[in-house]
């Protein structure tokens, strides 16, 4: 057999590894060889991979320097000299710029400044919050015209003794009664055990001769009639409730006494209700 390597032009690199056998009288000078199949490495599964012996072979044994060039192989640099260490001196206070000195020497001054800034900020925030709350509460308060109607001044000399005068206050009838000495003694002598809503006469008046009441029946809100009823005080025509001259319920379905508003005597002849 005769072995001839085929070579032809640009395909020579591709065809150089091929051979063709031709029958002949001469023996081939070079026998065609078949590349041997590489053997697969056998791994020892019982041997730990992350051991001192396995890792020591991969560790760097000498310093490497990065090189760049056409004929220079690439390498890894494990040591850098161009790294800039960050400097925070601009953000530090002058008292602690020197790293060789202890910061305890200037700690009191630095703490005092921090406390001062915190205190000033707290006062400013509290003042702003106070103004905001004040404005919010003021917006919810009644206007000047409403406040003017919230109080009423009554001249007492216009009400004769033994008479009752009605006024309009906050949309409700207001009774002002000038009692006689007989009425005062009569109401003061009433036993509390006889009353449905026990209350002494002196607890309902500031001056014995003057009784100030809200003229609304405590049963269903009707307006009682003054100087009427079985007890000479007030009488509700709706359901027959009887009140005495002190405004206390004595007979009928009303459960409570007539309400006594807040009032104040500014002089002997003037009273302000509200």
UniProtKB/Swiss-Prot annotation:
It is found in: Mitochondrion inner membrane. The Rieske protein is a high potential 2Fe-2S protein. The gene is UQCRFS1. It is an enzyme of class 7 (translocase). It comes from Symphalangus syndactylus. It comes from the Eukaryota. Keywords: 2Fe-2S, Disulfide bond, Electron transport, Iron, Iron-sulfur, Membrane, Metal-binding, Mitochondrion, Mitochondrion inner membrane, Respiratory chain, Transit peptide, Translocase, Transmembrane, Transmembrane helix, Transport. This is Cytochrome b-c1 complex subunit Rieske, mitochondrial. Residues 141-274 are mitochondrial intermembrane.
